[in-house]
Amino acid sequence: VHVLVTADTLTGVWTYARELVTGLASRGIRVTLVSFGEVPLPHQTAWMDTLHGLDYRPTAFRLDWMGEGEQDLKDSAAYLADLVREIRPDVAHFNQPCYGDLPISIPRIVVAHSDLISWWVAVHGQEPAESRWLRWYRDVWSRGIAGANAVVAPSSWMMRTLESCYGSPRRSKVIYNGRNPIFFNPYVTKDDSVLAVGRLWDAGKQLSLLTQRTLPLPVCIVGTDQPSVPAHLPIRADVKVATDEVCVALKGPQTEAQLRVLYSRSSIYVATSRYEPFSMSALEAAFSRCAIIANDIPSLREIWGDTAVYFRTNDPESLAEKIRLLSENGDLQRSYAGLAYSRARERFTAKRMIDEYLDLYRNLLYRSAAA
């Protein structure tokens, strides 16, 4: 079997694609991987060096939600159609739903990791104002979802949201994201500290909740673009957000090795997002045996069930209370860490994810052959 996979190098889809492609290649599946967004740096592609059966085609086509993405979508669609004719794969696995109606003769799977309209609704409480660009965006997503042979989402919440925004697909399937637990160390002695990952200014990630109340433990936010931090949060020379009430350490983007160390040493991971179709970073924290404190939103409830501690939706006071609760009760903190770790091992491994995608590929190929 030969699978064409698309990914982008700008978001967490790149991590997802690495797990997918590595898992497929390890099972003898031939993969052609096309990336969009930016041509990746060498450290982003080092994982490919030992893979057999991988043909990698980096491009700089912009994504549909980016500036000038509309023009690039036409060009990237033509590129993909030409590539399919050249390499003749058996299945197309597009991680951008806008390609679901690409005029090719093989089964087309699209995966909707997130989308602009549902992000806007979660952040602003209403749909974005109508514009020519928004009508174009909604149209290409609706056509892609209607045209695909199968539409995948990383949570049931995301699938329901997708259908309400863009219409029902011909066939839908929820396949939860997965990570390989071998990358993470759950056995390191923990520091009494809190970790969160994301940009402080990102309204969807809502990490500013961690700066609004006095907290009993040191907090580290990773992946912050310091020049974009709002002006009311003064940045000292030692790279900390410091006010009378809060002291939060900010770290710029980390390598995977650096981030794994931070996960392994932190006792608590906080998922503050008000928009989160899955949360790969929370999963990585769970594999590192961090207790998870999560915003009480439907998608995080779906993923973590009763294995996380939840704070009242978007409420900084409740978040501070839950951090205080775990900081004052080591047994409870370790119990929740163990629960999150077990749930990750049972439900969200890369192996399980690959199994489900292979089943979907085979089913679509069988239907295609029988048609």
Q: What does each model-found stretch correspond to?
A:
Residues 91, 103-127, 152:
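Active-site proximal beta-strand in glycosyltransferases
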Residues 130-151:
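Membrane-proximal helix-turn-helix segments that form the acceptor-binding/catalytic region
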Residues 145, 261-266:
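Short alpha-helical donor nucleotide-sugar binding micro-motif in glycosyltransferases
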Residues 146-147, 153, 159-179, 187:
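Helix-loop-beta element that forms the nucleotide-linked donor phosphate-binding surface
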Residues 188-205, 209-223:
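Conserved donor-binding/catalytic core segment of Leloir-type glycosyltransferases
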Residues 274:
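Aromatic "clamp/platform" in nucleotide-sugar-dependent glycosyltransferases that forms part
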Residues 291-294:
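Short hydrophobic beta-strand element within catalytic cores of glycosyltransferases
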Residues 308-317, 325-331:
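Conserved acidic donor-binding segment of nucleotide-sugar-dependent glycosyltransferases
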